[in-house]
A protein has these predicted regions:
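Ubiquitin-like/PB1-type beta-grasp interaction modules and other compact soluble beta-rich domains
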Residues: 1-60, 64-83, 103-110
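Non-catalytic interaction/regulatory segments
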Residues: 82, 91-167
Length: 167
């Protein structure tokens, strides 16, 4: 099979904005998704609502990674949409300063510049519960424990060394 990204480059497609995901037979998939047979494929950039959601989720992922590196004991909560952004609550045991925000922004830019790949991990739900429990992500643990699903998938940045997970 070929990844959606390979197909995109193979057809030399040109979008005015970076492609962030695709619909395969009308189902949203990441660009690492492998296609094995003939499929209807629609590549998406940020002009599409699904593409914009993918882009925003990836930025939240980068934010979580930056915060976890700069404030290992900190807790970040992405709570709800506000205007054209999201309300976030960062708890690091003291008031957040402008310098903290600047450091987070700088680290996010560095992470983006590293061009780290997102990897989809599929495993037994019990394994995912263990992974999220070790990282103190108790809200995800509770959700998975009551999901009734035998298998779960999650995404990670980097398979080796430091990884950040999101459900």
């Amino acid at each position: 099979g070929s990844s959606l990204l390979d197909i995109y480059y193979g057809f030399n497609l040109n979008f005015p904005y970076q492609v962030v995901s695709a619909k395969v037979n009308n189902r949203s998939e990441g660009l690492n998704f492998k296609v094995y047979n003939n499929k209807d494929i629609e590549f998406l950039d940020v002009r599409d609502s699904s593409g914009m959601r993918t882009y925003v989720r990836s930025l939240c992922f980068v934010l979580f990674k930056a915060v976890s590196e700069l404030f290992p004991e900190g807790k970040l909560f992405v709570e709800h949409p506000v205007s054209k952004g999201y309300f976030c609550n960062l708890r690091i045991g003291r008031p957040i300063t402008l310098e903290d925000v600047t450091r987070i922004k700088q680290r996010m830019q560095e992470i983006i510049a590293e061009n780290i790949s997102y990897h989809r991990i599929e495993c037994h739900t019990a394994e995912a519960v263990r992974v999220f429990s070790e990282r103190g992500m108790n809200d995800k643990v509770r959700l998975l424990e009551t999901s009734g699903s035998l298998y779960t998938y999650y995404y990670t940045l980097r398979l080796y060394g430091c990884s950040v997970n999101a459900g």
